[in-house]
Amino acid sequence: MALPPFFAQSRQGPPPPQPPPSAPFGCPPPPLPSPAFPPPLPQRPGPFPGASAPFLQPPLALQPRAPAEASRGGGGGGAFFPVPPPPLPPPPPQCRPFPGPDAVERPRPPPPGPGPPWSPRWAEAPPPPDVLGDAALQRLRDRQWLEAVFGNPRRPGGLRTPRTPAGPSLGEVRARLRSALRLVRRLRSLGQSLREAEADGAAWASLHAQAAPLRAELAERLQPLRQAAYVGEARRRLERVRRRVRVRERARDRRLSGRRGAQRTEREQEIDRWRVKCVQEVEEKKRDEELKAAADGVLAEVRKKQSDTKRMVDILRALEKLRKLRKEAAARKGVCPPASADETFEHHLQRLRKLIKKRSELYEAEERALRVMLEGEQEEERRRELEKKQRKEKEKLLLQKREIESKLFGDPDEFPLAHLLQPFRQYYLQAEHSLPALIQIRHDWDQYLVPSDHPKGNSVPQGWVLPPLPSNDIWATAIQLH
């Protein structure tokens, strides 16, 4: 393939114009070089079919130079490798569709003529490098390439296909119907006036003159509405708008239902928590009553003994008071008991009081021991209840953890040992089975510890960081929720 004119070492001008070859399948012949149709730029064959990708021209130092120019270039004296120029983009397509029987002949381009002196794209060859120099020649080549790549493509000079007019808008149809309705109302009132003014010819003629333009305007307004295409396009647009409104309403209903469902779930959770709290309070009160009843049953015997002791003390006090009254009555009669009788009575009273006091202390010690025993049993019962509650909470947490792990790593029951992801599961769960691995993981985490008042510091999450819920319905359809 011959080099373009601006790559040739010495060329006087463009080649003479050749007759255009026959164009197959109705494609017009390529235009001749002229001011209206610049010549196509040459292409270098590449390894792929079709036009090669546009590349910029190589630097001037890498382009081949003539021997004379190389000998004239001073300084350096290095050898230049014969690097071929990069491919240039193809010209804009000049073909049109296959003409039909009613197609007109495509106008021929004007004959070639001298182009404007400021346009370097025409068929005239640029001056040799000796006249322009390396920098000017490089600028000329860059300008030609930029004009070929980024220039406005020239449209073929044939008949343009008329653009299909856009369909009627709903606002236009609505305005047309409203204006037609107003005209109908006006014409109806004029018709009533015409029927009333049949006897008066002048008034009837005046009213008829007013109704004629309104009738013509109404016919003009209703003319598009009689066309099936116009009405069909309006109906399609109206159906499209209705469909869009239905889609928006369904999306809004889904959002509202989801919000209501979330609120309903939250209220149900609050009600469940309140019910659990009430049940726990009732159970605690019932348990306290049962423990109190059991304690009363155990301490009943001791309390009976204590009550007997108090009754004996009261009896002794009453006996002492009775003897004092009898002694006073005998003294009034002149009978005085001997002093030994008083000493014997006081001796028996002191002995009985000591015995009752000793029994009371013994009963109190027994009551304290029983109370301590009952408190220990009650504490043991509370501890068992707390352990049972903690066991339930732990089972619940383990079940939740198992569910989270099944979501992240799959169900362990359905996870065979020879599964492809088993090494990954062992790697991420190695801290649960190996103490050195746990220490190493905690050591790796502790390397990122910062003071509590650090602005960018935060606590290490206690569990798995689960992804958030889908943000919209379209994303939710791509996720299988369990």
UniProtKB/Swiss-Prot annotation:
The protein's name is: Programmed cell death protein 7
| Lineage of the species this protein comes from | Eukaryota, Metazoa, Chordata, Craniata, Vertebrata
Short name of one Pfam family: PDCD7
Alphabetized UniProt keyword annotations: Apoptosis, Coiled coil, Nucleus
In which residue ranges is the amino acid composition biased (Low complexity)?
49-71, 151-168
Q: Which InterPro entries match?
A: Apoptosis_promoter, PDCD7
Listed Pro residues bias regions? 13-48, 82-100, 109-130
Keyword Nucleotide-binding found: no
What is one process in the GO biological process aspect for this record? positive regulation of T cell apoptotic process
For this record, the Gene Ontology CC terms, alphabetical, are: spliceosomal complex; U12-type spliceosomal complex; U2AF complex
The record describes the protein's role as: Promotes apoptosis when overexpressed.
* Record's subcellular location: Nucleus
Q: Coiled coil: which residue ranges?
A: 233-408
What inducers act on this gene?
Upon induction of apoptosis in embryonic stem cells by treatment with dexamethasone, staurosporine or C2-ceramide.
Q: Which residue ranges are recorded for the region named Disordered?
A: 1-136, 151-170
- Nucleus recorded as keyword: yes
- Name the tissues where it is expressed: Highly expressed in testis, thymus and lymph nodes. Detected at low levels in embryonic stem cells.
Q: How does it assemble?
A: Interacts with RBM40. Component of the U11/U12 snRNPs that are part of the U12-type spliceosome.
